[in-house]
């Protein structure tokens, strides 16, 4: 049994979740392909302060209404049979109830959900003895792979195209992620003392 660390937004939720909200709020017509940087202030031509004001007003409804990524549910249902599913997200802690309600509404299994309130997930990864992490944020993937010394499956997106470490595996969807995991399971099995 492996302890799988899994990000939420852009990993089990659709990567274009924010697009309709951004388009409506900022009177734009962007698509996911226009989001070539995780920092949306550049695309929106606004300051960090303006962005976080917008997030404070909108993130609860965005997370509440987020759609699942393609094949995420069936893949997670398969993985839960053999592994612990530990979700580690950058969401802030005031979103705890909305997060749990979303998981229940989507009927997504979890063994634990941790909202770390920022993009530094390494401490939580180490605390939970994660064997493999699933992520969409390039910076998080690099940090986890290097500092926690574990493989990271990085879900390909227009905003994470920077070069990657040898401990990071790019996939296009959940089917590819599960296939890679099944093909490499023997390398990942935790040695129990």
From Swiss-Prot:
Gene3D superfamilies: HAD superfamily/HAD-like (3.40.50.1000). It comes from the Bacteria. Signal peptide: none annotated. Keywords: Hydrolase. The keyword Cytoplasm does not apply. SUPFAM superfamilies: HAD-like. Its EC number is 3.1.3.-. GO terms for molecular function: hydrolase activity. PANTHER family: NUCLEOTIDASE YQFW-RELATED. Belongs to the 5'(3')-deoxyribonucleotidase family. This is Putative nucleotidase YqfW. It comes from Bacillus subtilis (strain 168). The gene is yqfW.
